[in-house]
């Protein structure tokens, strides 16, 4: 516990033994994050980012056999159109961008970045230090929910 006084005022700073999680209090967007050390964002059952993007893609085009076929066909076409080496970070980025172009028809999404250096900080615009930071997920909401809410 820390204390400070100035004139008639007394400031007391002490540990909060039962802090609340701000993600448990009426959130509009859902945070889906993937990190090997930290449990970030909201609970989800996605295996990885590809599983997450596939799910939102199918929710956009139709979560049925036809939608699954469209998804597979889109990936096949990307293999021919993307010039970066298959599996490279540049290739993965381009695949994600193309999937999100379709997903953006029904969803609003922002990337989530983490800076990990003597504590962690998150934002949606990225950090200038690529060594200690990178994208860890997305925060998203459906356009339908946004229109209903606002």
Which residues does each predicted region cover?
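Acidic interaction surfaces
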Residues: 1-150
